[in-house]
């Protein structure tokens, strides 16, 4: 009966059995506790009914060892007081440390605030103690504007290099094309000489050139014999237009030239012939130049750097000169 009561009280893991027997033998006046035999067929390590280890005092009741280890009453009162005191001390130390850091932070902010107000740009460009670069202030301040301008200048510098390389490549390609087309242009010149007024009709029939040709310009163009375009000075990429005229009542020039410099942005006039007028007092044809606000073929031909002349040069050299037959009136084809 005694063994049956002992087996019905508590259960301890297999690994604690030897420890229970050893500790029980050390207690004065307490008989050694024999571990209950393992039931047949039970695997090793299963929980068995044993008496727990009680370090202080006589063994009165049998309770599970796990409950003894985790029970709050196993700690003595002195230990509980010590643990409570340690917790309070730790909280106080953490609180004091936080207040101390907060006070140091407030003092540092108060010391830096006047300097930041005096020189906000320096505050944007300065680095912290760890060497991390601070971001510029938002809102379009001086530091941000300066950064944007520096970025824009750097981009413009890169674009200048690209434009220079493109200009050089474009000039080389254009020179090769001009050399290949020259024999064909020479043959075309010979053929056009047998077609009276060819260039004048092609110019007046051009949709963009016709808008700047007045009635007086048509009369002037009736004396035009030929048109030639040549490229010279490859280093400066210069182009020259030469207008050949027969004897006429307006000027003595047999050839009127217009020189332009070709760049990546278009044509820029550099020089033009000086017109030798015939009988300005009698004919008064120079009075047509009084309206300098209107762009006409005569104003463009006879004036130097007339406003809008770059567009006319572009039309003649890039469109009319390589493709004159395209603009020659169809009904005049023979």
From Swiss-Prot:
<comment type="similarity">
    <text>Belongs to the nucleosome assembly protein (NAP) family.</text>
</comment>
<dbReference type="Pfam" id="PF00956">
    <property type="entry name" value="NAP"/>
</dbReference>
<feature type="compositionally biased region" description="Basic and acidic residues">
    <location>
        <begin position="115"/>
        <end position="128"/>
    </location>
</feature>
<dbReference type="GO" id="GO:0000785">
    <property type="term" value="C:chromatin"/>
</dbReference>
<dbReference type="GO" id="GO:0007283">
    <property type="term" value="P:spermatogenesis"/>
</dbReference>
<dbReference type="GO" id="GO:0005737">
    <property type="term" value="C:cytoplasm"/>
</dbReference>
<feature type="compositionally biased region" description="Basic and acidic residues">
    <location>
        <begin position="96"/>
        <end position="108"/>
    </location>
</feature>
<dbReference type="GO" id="GO:0005634">
    <property type="term" value="C:nucleus"/>
</dbReference>
<feature type="modified residue" description="Phosphoserine">
    <location>
        <position position="4"/>
    </location>
</feature>
<keyword id="KW-0744">Spermatogenesis</keyword>
<keyword id="KW-0597">Phosphoprotein</keyword>
<feature type="region of interest" description="Disordered">
    <location>
        <begin position="27"/>
        <end position="46"/>
    </location>
</feature>
<comment type="function">
    <text>May be involved in sperm differentiation and proliferation.</text>
</comment>
<keyword id="KW-0334">Gonadal differentiation</keyword>
<dbReference type="InterPro" id="IPR002164">
    <property type="entry name" value="NAP_family"/>
</dbReference>
<protein>
    <recommendedName>
        <fullName>Testis-specific Y-encoded protein 1</fullName>
    </recommendedName>
</protein>
<dbReference type="InterPro" id="IPR037231">
    <property type="entry name" value="NAP-like_sf"/>
</dbReference>
<dbReference type="GO" id="GO:0030154">
    <property type="term" value="P:cell differentiation"/>
</dbReference>
<dbReference type="GO" id="GO:0042393">
    <property type="term" value="F:histone binding"/>
</dbReference>
<keyword id="KW-0539">Nucleus</keyword>
<dbReference type="GO" id="GO:0006334">
    <property type="term" value="P:nucleosome assembly"/>
</dbReference>
<keyword id="KW-0221">Differentiation</keyword>
<dbReference type="GO" id="GO:0007506">
    <property type="term" value="P:gonadal mesoderm development"/>
</dbReference>
<feature type="region of interest" description="Disordered">
    <location>
        <begin position="96"/>
        <end position="146"/>
    </location>
</feature>
<keyword id="KW-0963">Cytoplasm</keyword>
<dbReference type="GO" id="GO:0003682">
    <property type="term" value="F:chromatin binding"/>
</dbReference>
<keyword id="KW-0217">Developmental protein</keyword>
